[in-house]
Structures are given as C-alpha cells and as structure tokens.
Amino acid sequence: MTHERQQRQRDPRAAQCLALVFALPAWCLGDERAAAEKVNALAQAGNDSITEQYQPAQGISGRVTIVGSDTMQPLMAKLAAAFKSFQPNTKFGVEGHGSSEAIREFMLGLSLQHRGDKSGGKGTQGASSSDLLASSRPLTEQERKGFVSHHGYEPIGIPIAMDAVAIYVHNDNPIQRLTLEQIDGIFSSTLKRSKGGHLTTWGQVGLKDQWSQQPIHLYGRNKKSGTREFFKHVALIDGELHEDVQEQPGSASEILAIAQDPLAIGYAGVGFQSSMVRIVPLAHEAEGAATLPSAETVANGRYPLARPLYLYVNKNPKEKLDPAVSEFLKFLNSRQGQETVARANFYPLTAAQISKNLELLGQSLVTARYNGR
C-alpha cells in the first residue's frame, strides 16, 4: 500500500466523510413501510409469513454487552436502539472489531469494552464479560470445544439475519458479471476453482478498450474478520488469498479504498453498499445467470455468497438467563426485530427460521415475564 493511500486512510476527515456516506443509505431505508414490505417480500418467497408482534415484558432493565463482527456492528447497534424504544431502562455496549477476535473474547468470557456506568465492576473498565457474540460465521468445532472447555457447557447459537458478501468495484468500472471461478482466479493463490490461472488484468475478465490492459487491484479484510474466513471458505473453496490483497481493518475502510481506486475490486457485506461503489452480479457457473444479492436471491440460494449472521448466547443451563438478554432475544425474533434488520440493509429471516430459533432458545427464554425480577 502506498504512503499516500495510508495517509488518506488515517485522515480523520476521510473517516467523517465515510460515516456520513454510510449513514445516509441506512437512514433512507428507515421508512417503516419499506421495511415491512421487505419482510413480506421475503415471506412470500418462502411461502410463509412473520406475524408475531413483539409484546414487551414489564420491568426489564440491565446492561447487555455484545462483542463481535465488524459487519454486524451497525446491525446490532440499530437492533439495540429499536429494542430500547420498547425497553428504555436497558443499556447496551456493542463492540465490532471482527468475528475471529471477538470469538476468543466470548470463549474466555472477556470484554475489552470500557464503560462509564460503573455497573458490574469498579472503575471505567466495568464490563468483564460479554453476554452475546455477533458473528458473521458459525463457530468452528475447535472454537466450540474451547468454549466448552472454559465454561463447561455449549453456547447457544441462532441466525438473526441473512447477509450476502458482495463483490465491489469502483463506480466507473463497467464489469457486468463475474463467476465464482473468476473470483477464485482474481483473489486466490491456490486456484481451487480457476482453470485459467491467475487473473491479473481487467481484460482477462472481459473488459475491453482502455480497460483491457489495466491491472486488477485487490482489497479485502484482515485476519480478524469472519467475512474473510467466509469468503475463503465459499468463494475460494478453503483456498488461500493472494499476497497482493491489500487487507483493511474494517469493511468501511475497505469500501473507501475501493471508492478511491478505479482499478479496485474487493469483498464486503452487502450492508456497506454506497453510491461511491458498485456491486457486481455473480454467477455460480459461466453458463448460469448472474444475480445481485436481494431478499429473494439470498433466500432461494441463487446468489452464490449468501450467509446467515449469527448471535451466540453464553447461557449456563443451571442458571436463568439475564432478563434483559432474554427479552432482547425475543425481540430479535419478532416482526419488529426483523423489520429493524431490513432497515439496517440486511435480509430478514423466514418464518421457518424464526420458528427454529424459538424452539432452540426454549419457552423460558422467549415468553417469560419477569416483572422486574
């Protein structure tokens, strides 16, 4: 990465500009009717409907600490804010520094979050453990075993939204479609899909004229990212990323880098789309139709890089779950919770997925009334 680009990324004015750029699309999606229509569209695609309204329990208070995915941080912040509109006596701490690092914290019952309410500890550190883990990938078997080894019981994991990892290019790039084989040829050093070798110029993926000899500049996420692991697993068939990938600490910084580089290509969650960049339609195979991520193409599997977003709960089976955490989980699986997912530019769950979640969580977690206890 050039010194000039590093300076631009450290410029606080660039960060402020980026915050505005990403706040605007999310705000535009905030219309209640649009969110409801998105939920209904997905329900129709799956021949089901999400009808259960959130019924707030009385007397809920306390603090909920969530660690996890950079991709999910904006989603969790919006869900927390929506929940607080029903339960104003609750407080939330949401960290989003990457799934892989957060999983380690969750396994060990740690949180690096500073807090000023002084509850649950002395001084400003306060939060010594995380209640929930937001992860853009499922826990590995080794990670599950690590959690059990430390806590003595299994974590509870549920999907709370659907997402798609999108392929982003500069807004001026005319590329109309890519296949998974081409994605492997562009990003991978191990080429488990690609039969045509490494693809290093835009002409090799179909662009002509002044684009044909231009090099492809690669951008991606760093090793703390669950999105990176998902991309390697699905798009590259557990292959390795090319050493030329310029790894970024977060999705927002990656999108900013792509917006500043006309020859760029990168991958990030669909929730980070903006007017500065463009999402490329993807096809499973060369002869197949290329699709953009949408509620329908994610639900029916036509979009190749669809994925669930997970929330893991640290619940000792011998103890009652904290009322604030339990009520928040109930909210996530309600119509209002899933409409918040839609407003955050992610895709809501189907009713079948909601039903499985409620069954897994158990009746005591999602329907109990605590009355302040």
Predicted regions and their residues:
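N-terminal secretory signal peptides that target proteins for export/translocation
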Residues: 1-12
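Bacterial N-terminal signal peptides
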Residues: 16-26
